[in-house]
């Protein structure tokens, strides 16, 4: 639904459990690839069993042009994802002619961690944030309908019609 509403192709992001079940990252990536529709862009998690860069190169060789990106999610027990790791991955991927493969990082990301990567101009294409968002303080809000097809309407107790909300986007 999100991809249809935004007019973008969907992408699939491989979970940690898949390589664990198949016992091999490349085998898991191939199964992941085989069961996704061709319109779904593939992002494969690496580093479950071995070196992130080495696994990324093996996955890239296996999926070639069908691979949109690599996701690195190195646990904090191993130092987490570092800018040096991302720089090495990009350089090695470029050397092997996988310039089209994007790099995504995840794992304990906070605004400060993301800023660190940005300030160093690290070649990260996207950040997948989970626990920082899910652990955030509640933000009470309502998603009231105030207008339908240019007709002002609202539930009892609310003022119908458009709001002058500069931070609101029409969907």
Whereabouts are the PLM-identified features?
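Buried, small/hydrophobic-residue-enriched core segments of structured protein domains
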Residues: 1-96, 111-116, 148
